[in-house]
Amino acid sequence: MDWESPSNATCCAECPVRVTADIIEHKWTTLIVRELVSGKKRFSELERSLVSISPKVLSERLKELEAKRIVCRTVFPTVPPTTEYELTAIGKELETVIRAMQYFGTLLLKSAESLEQASK
């Protein structure tokens, strides 16, 4: 993989890392994508699984992800209306990013645990 130099990457709108960061940079966005990696979810399911997210913020993030073609929304003609969210084909590609973050987070947690034990 070719890496651009940081000076070019930060100012270039076509920088792949910047494009990805623009999608996942907002609070809760990465966790919403993580929840959708396993499949379709209703709004209420997402709300329950993302403890402490407000309905307003969840709605905003889902709209942003839909506008960026990461998430697809399907509304069913029921009373009350049922809405499901799922990752689009390109959205599903973010699973590798989420898995890399999970791996890195696990390393950090283990490292912090090791440092804590060593200081005792």
Labelled PLM ranges:
Residues 111-120:
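Short, charged recognition helix plus adjacent turn
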Residues 11-57, 84, 92, 115:
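N-terminal helix-turn-helix DNA-binding core of bacterial DNA-binding proteins
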Residues 19, 93-111:
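Short, solvent-exposed amphipathic helices
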Residues 58, 62-65:
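Basic amphipathic alpha-helical segments that dock to polyanions
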Residues 72-73:
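Short beta-strand "wing" residues that participate in macromolecule-binding interfaces
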Residues 1-12, 120:
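N-terminal intrinsically disordered/low-complexity leader segments
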